[in-house]
Amino acid sequence: KIANGSGSEQDIAEAKI
C-alpha cells in the first residue's frame, strides 16, 4: 500500500507484512 496522509505509519507497516 502507498501511505495516505493520515495513518501512514500503519499503511506502511501493513505493506511490509
Swiss-Prot record:
Subcellular location: Mitochondrion; Mitochondrion inner membrane
Subunit: F-type ATPases have 2 components, CF(1) - the catalytic core - and CF(0) - the membrane proton channel. CF(1) has five subunits: alpha(3), beta(3), gamma(1), delta(1), epsilon(1). CF(0) has three main subunits: a, b and c.
Disulfide bonds: none
GO annotation terms (biological process): ATP biosynthetic process; proton transmembrane transport
Role this protein plays: Mitochondrial membrane ATP synthase (F(1)F(0) ATP synthase or Complex V) produces ATP from ADP in the presence of a proton gradient across the membrane which is generated by electron transport complexes of the respiratory chain. F-type ATPases consist of two structural domains, F(1) - containing the extramembraneous catalytic core, and F(0) - containing the membrane proton channel, linked together by a central stalk and a peripheral stalk. During catalysis, ATP turnover in the catalytic domain of F(1) is coupled via a rotary mechanism of the central stalk subunits to proton translocation.
UniProt-recorded name of the protein: ATP synthase subunit delta, mitochondrial
Keywords for this protein: Allergen, ATP synthesis, CF(1), Hydrogen ion transport, Ion transport, Membrane, Mitochondrion, Mitochondrion inner membrane, Transport
Similarity comment: Belongs to the ATPase epsilon chain family.
UniProt keyword S-adenosyl-L-methionine, yes or no: no
Cellular component annotations (GO), alphabetically ordered: mitochondrial inner membrane; proton-transporting ATP synthase complex
Gene name in the database record: atp16
Domain of life of the organism encoding this protein: Eukaryota
